[in-house]
C-alpha cells in the first residue's frame, strides 16, 4: 500500500481554527503595544529636543527656546527650537532655527504648562518656574495611562507615566 504524505483537509481546518482563536486573543494586546510604543516614541522625541536645547544653550552661551507652533499651550502641531537672541520667548528676525519638531499624529495630543520654554546659558530653565510639564495623552482614551515629560528647575528632563484627564 502506498502512503501519501501531507495533511488532510480536517487537520488543516483544525489548525486554521486554532490560529484564528490565537489571533483574536493576541490582537488587543498587540494594539495596546503599538499605542504604547507610539506614545513612548513621541515622548522620547520631545525629550531629545529638550536635551538638545539645554546642551546648545550651554555650548553657545546664550538662551535657547522651544516654542509651540500653535499660539496656545498645545504642542500637538509641533515646535520650533531657536537661539533666542532677540526678544526673550518670541521668535523674531534675529533668531536662527536650530531644529523643528514634527506634528503629532492623532489621536495623540500634547499640552504644556505654557507655549514657550527656554534654557539659560547655564542650562537651567528660563524663566525659572518650579517645574515645567508636558502631558502626552490619547484624545480618545481618557483615564488611561499617558506620558508626562517634566523639566526640573535645574533643566533636567524626565519621563513618567501618569493618568490622562
Q: Positions of the model-derived regions?
A:
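N-terminal helix-rich module
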Residues: 2, 21, 25-55, 59, ...
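Glycine-centered recognition micro-motifs in short, flexible terminal segments and loops
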Residues: 1-25
Amino acid at each position: 500500500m502506498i502512503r501519501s504524505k501531507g495533511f488532510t483537509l480536517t487537520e488543516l481546518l483544525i489548525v486554521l481554527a486554532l490560529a484564528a482563536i490565537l489571533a483574536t486573543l493576541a490582537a488587543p494586546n498587540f494594539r495596546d503595544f503599538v499605542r504604547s510604543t507610539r506614545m513612548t516614541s513621541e515622548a522620547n522625541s520631545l525629550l531629545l529636543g529638550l536635551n538638545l536645547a539645554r546642551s546648545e544653550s550651554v555650548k553657545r552661551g546664550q538662551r535657547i527656546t522651544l516654542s509651540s507652533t500653535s499660539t496656545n499651550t498645545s504642542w500637538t502641531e509641533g515646535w520650533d527650537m531657536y537661539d533666542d537672541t532677540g526678544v526673550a520667548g518670541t521668535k523674531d528676525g534675529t533668531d536662527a532655527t536650530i531644529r523643528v519638531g514634527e506634528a503629532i499624529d492623532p489621536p495623540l495630543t500634547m499640552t504644556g504648562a505654557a507655549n514657550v520654554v527656554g534654557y539659560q546659558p547655564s542650562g537651567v530653565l528660563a524663566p525659572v518656574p518650579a517645574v515645567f510639564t508636558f502631558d502626552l495623552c490619547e484624545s480618545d482614551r481618557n483615564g488611561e495611562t499617558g506620558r508626562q515629560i517634566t523639566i526640573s528647575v535645574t533643566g533636567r528632563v524626565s519621563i513618567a507615566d501618569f493618568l490622562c484627564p
